[in-house]
Design a protein with these regions (language model features):
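N-terminal glycine-rich phosphate-binding loop and ensuing alpha1 helix
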Residues: 1-61
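Residues at the starts of beta-strands that form the adenosine-phosphate
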Residues: 2, 47-49, 73, 126, ...
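Structural beta-sheet core signal
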Residues: 5, 51, 102, 127-130, ...
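A structural signal for short hydrophobic beta-strand segments in well-ordered beta-sheet cores
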Residues: 25, 143-145, 197, 208
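Glycine-rich phosphate-binding loop at the start of an alpha helix
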Residues: 35, 86, 193
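Alpha-helical elements of Rossmann-like donor-binding domains used by nucleotide-donor carbohydrate transfer enzymes
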Residues: 36, 40, 59, 91, ...
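Catalytic-core segments of class I nucleotidyltransferases/pyrophosphorylases
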Residues: 46, 100-101, 108, 114-121, ...
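Conserved beta-loop-beta/alpha segment of the NTase-like Rossmann-fold superfamily
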Residues: 61-62, 66-147, 183
Length: 226
């Protein structure tokens, strides 16, 4: 199964920590967070990796190369201009397997990806989201699901929310089917959450995978140091 890791963002919120390297290369105990992601994937047999890069992407490409010394095979898609966090998917569609993993590049995790993928296949889903509670639901996409774990509503950060809601957020780890790229999306920059995933809410094609497994987002200095 192909793994796509999104590493093309500028990481503007992390400039106070590292302005000369991309966010996925920020070290955790001496090793880049992206290296730790790749190590976790490799240990579970996910070795076919495509990394989308943009801002300071040469730093990532120079460090990981073809992935051989990390036990994986890595190819790259370099965004010459910003495409949004999902725009590159349409450019590499022909390189994807029918189902593929799509991961943010700035998270620490220790999860069973094979079980996650099997859950997706069992539900014959177009999209499956790894969901969990976190410390900042106000700054995250909140997911509301039915009793079968099908996603009914996706509440983005800017959406009005009920007074009380379950702290269930999208962790930035997904199993997707290529069918999701058959949608017609307008605009030069494509937002994964708002333009590809959110429209699937309520259709019975997107499920959430609630799990207590370890996932830590490194998206801000506060979360990095926590």
């Amino acid at each position: 199964m192909k793994v796509v890791i999104m590493a093309g963002g500028k990481g503007t919120r992390m400039l106070s920590i590292a302005s000369d390297i991309p966010k996925p290369m920020i070290p955790i105990e001496g090793r880049p967070v992206l290296e730790r992601e790749i190590e976790c994937l490799c240990e579970q047999g996910f070795t076919d990796i495509l990394i989308t890069v943009g801002h300071l992407g040469n730093v990532i490409m120079d460090y990981f190369g073809n992935g051989l010394k990390f036990g994986v095979h890595i190819t790259y898609y370099f965004e010459k201009k910003p495409l949004g966090n999902a725009g590159a998917l349409f450019q590499v569609k022909d390189q994807l397997t029918d189902d593929f993993l799509l991961l943010n590049a700035d998270a620490m995790f220790d999860i069973d990806f094979n079980r996650f993928v099997q859950y997706h296949k069992t539900h014959d889903a177009v999209a499956t989201l790894f969901t969990h509670p976190n410390s900042h639901p106000y700054d995250s996409g909140v997911i509301i699901a039915d009793e079968h774990m099908a996603v009914r509503k996706w509440l983005a950060k800017e959406d009005e929310r009920p007074e009380y809601f379950k702290n269930r957020v999208n962790a930035g780890l997904h199993v997707l089917n290529k069918k999701i790229l058959e949608q017609t999306v307008e605009g030069g920059k494509i937002d994964l959450d708002r333009q590809l995933l959110k429209p699937l809410a309520g259709t019975g094609q997107m499920y959430c995978y609630d799990s207590p497994e370890y996932v830590k987002d490194m998206g801000t200095p506060e979360r990095y140091y926590a």
